[in-house]
């Protein structure tokens, strides 16, 4: 059994990473989305333990001090972090894990473990602003702040293994699914399985 692959999807806020991730885990039972810890309040219909683990700042800091975070970041005065234990235990079972995090979190993870990273670029800043506005969860000032942060985030695209322009969401979903499928078939991920299969072929007689 191969070890699972850790996939990272990043994008500016409103860039589509969460929507794409939800599609992937709905299509493929052999991949699970990592649920991040956060100190922010739930938005809309978000549920604890499904969308995020909503914790207090004291609880978050305790987890951080105990080494439970594979990566962490602060965004708009809210803290976010990925569980190190969940990632390792899930990968050990041969199940792939998908993390939706920003470029800073991706940078931290790259320094600690192997991963495949995908960055989603918005087709334009105007379309990104429209997406942020349509969510109806942020004030005008927060949206302007997110757009400024987006300009910083997209400059880090070259650190990623794959970069896609998310102009057509349906097309982007299929492209990311294809990337995951291709990565699973690489020999480095399946060397032992292929080696055993080839050995069995060599033992056969014609």
Curated annotation (Swiss-Prot):
Primary localization: cytoplasm
Superkingdom of this protein's organism: Bacteria
A GO molecular-function descriptor: ATP binding
Cellular localisation: Cytoplasm
Keywords linked to the UniProt accession: ATP-binding, Cytoplasm, Kinase, Nucleotide-binding, Transferase
EC number of the protein: 2.7.4.8
Recorded catalytic activity of this chain's protein: GMP + ATP = GDP + ADP
Signal peptide: none
Protein's UniProt keywords contain NAD: no
HAMAP family cross-referenced by the UniProt entry: Guanylate_kinase
NCBIfam families hit by this protein: guanyl_kin (TIGR03263)
Protein purpose: Essential for recycling GMP and indirectly, cGMP.
Family recorded in the similarity comment: Belongs to the guanylate kinase family.
Protein name in the entry: Guanylate kinase
Annotated organism of origin: Neorickettsia sennetsu (strain ATCC VR-367 / Miyayama)
């Amino acid at each position: 059994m191969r070890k699972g692959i850790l996939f990272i999807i990043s994008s500016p806020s409103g860039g589509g990473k969460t929507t794409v991730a939800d599609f992937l885990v709905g299509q493929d039972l052999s991949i699970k989305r990592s649920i991040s810890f956060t100190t922010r309040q739930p938005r809309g219909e978000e549920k604890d333990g499904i969308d995020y683990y909503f914790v207090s700042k004291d609880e978050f800091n305790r987890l951080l001090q105990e080494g439970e975070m594979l990566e962490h970041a602060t965004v708009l005065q809210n803290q976010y972090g990925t569980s190190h234990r969940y990632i390792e235990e899930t990968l050990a079972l041969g199940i792939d894990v998908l993390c939706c995090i920003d470029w800073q979190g991706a940078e931290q993870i790259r320094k600690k473990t192997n991963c495949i990273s995908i960055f989603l670029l918005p087709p334009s800043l105007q379309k990104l602003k429209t997406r942020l506005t349509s969510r109806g969860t942020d004030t005008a000032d927060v949206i302007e702040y997110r757009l400024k942060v987006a300009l910083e985030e997209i400059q880090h695209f070259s650190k990623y293994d794959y970069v896609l322009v998310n102009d057509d969401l349906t097309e982007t979903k299929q492209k990311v699914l294809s990337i995951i499928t291709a990565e699973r078939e690489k020999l480095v991920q399946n060397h032992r399985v292929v080696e055993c299969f080839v050995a069995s072929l060599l033992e056969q007689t014609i």
